[in-house]
Amino acid sequence: MNQLEFVKLHGNGNDFILIDELNGERIPEDEKSEASRILCHRNFGIGGDGVLFLVPSERADIGMRLFQPDGSEAEMCGNGIRCLAKHAWESGYVGERFSVETLAGVIPIQVRRDRKGFWARVEMGIPRFERSEIPADGEGTFLKVPLHGFEVSAVNTGVPHAVIFVENLDIPVEQIAPKIRHSSCFPEGANVNFVRLGNHLEVRTFERGVEAETLSCGTGSVAAAAVARRLGLVGETVEVMTKGGPLRISFAGEKAFMEGPAVTVCRGVVSDEILQTLQ
């Protein structure tokens, strides 16, 4: 493997290592999973909540693939796609309006920059509430279902999410969430969101694949807003506050939109010592 350049970015503290493969594969397909496990390690690697691969696409302007710290590939990531959009736009690959192919489908994006920094508005598609589309066991919708002592609702916003409304967010998320994340109700597992309703939504998310709480989750924020809207708790636009900062979630008809920032942290080259472990 030749020299491997990377870019480190974050969206509200949800941090990613980006590998640009638009002009050629940098990490072979059969090594991407293990490479992501190594690169994401916060002690022995670069550290991150996932590795983003910017790749060519025949269906959209560019493509995105995301491998998580456990080596699994995720269908979609809301914070990750904003980071990828920032790199693609600043590299001159795309204009202010473009589309990104993901495993969850083709995602339209609009980007801008103001005095506060870079922002991306992402069309997140129509949240899917049918159990067959989440997926979850059974038929119909999965709303306010008793599970492990909580009322759990579930929705797919690119990836499956469980949403739980609580009065107090000061709870041991990493002790409680794995029981729901691995519940037999969800054959592919689920991300788990604990949500407090106030003037805005406050969300803490335990992410599948990261297997830990992250500072922010874009698809989780959309899931929280979508379930709250479905239950009549919020209107067409809502601010979602994560530990890493706010996201603006809005709806036009049934389509959901997410708007938020992305920040470039650094650029670098993976050391020869780490490269040797990838070969």
Swiss-Prot record:
Bilayer-spanning residue ranges: none
Record field: catalytic activity: (2S,6S)-2,6-diaminopimelate = meso-2,6-diaminopimelate
Enzyme class: isomerase
Site (Could be important to modulate the pK values of the two catalytic cysteine residues): H161, E207
SUPFAM superfamilies with a match to the protein in the record: Diaminopimelate epimerase-like
GO MF term set: diaminopimelate epimerase activity
Pathway membership, UniProt: Amino-acid biosynthesis; L-lysine biosynthesis via DAP pathway; DL-2,6-diaminopimelate from LL-2,6-diaminopimelate: step 1/1
Pfam families recorded: DAP_epimerase
Active site: C77 (proton donor), C217 (proton acceptor)
Protein's cellular compartments: Cytoplasm
Alphabetized InterPro entries for the sequence: DAP_epimerase_DapF
UniProt GO BP: lysine biosynthetic process via diaminopimelate
Keyword Plastid among UniProt keywords: no
The keyword Isomerase appears for this protein: yes
UniProt EC number: 5.1.1.7
Residues reported in the UniProt entry to bind substrate: N14, Q68, G78, N79, N191, E207, R208, G218, T219
Entry's Gene Ontology cellular component terms: cytosol
Keywords: Amino-acid biosynthesis, Cytoplasm, Isomerase, Lysine biosynthesis
Family of this protein: Belongs to the diaminopimelate epimerase family.
Subunit composition and interactions: Homodimer.
HAMAP family for the chain: DAP_epimerase (MF_00197)
Protein task: Catalyzes the stereoinversion of LL-2,6-diaminopimelate (L,L-DAP) to meso-diaminopimelate (meso-DAP), a precursor of L-lysine.
UniProt protein name: Diaminopimelate epimerase
Organism whose genome encodes this protein: Methanothrix thermoacetophila (strain DSM 6194 / JCM 14653 / NBRC 101360 / PT) (Methanosaeta thermophila)
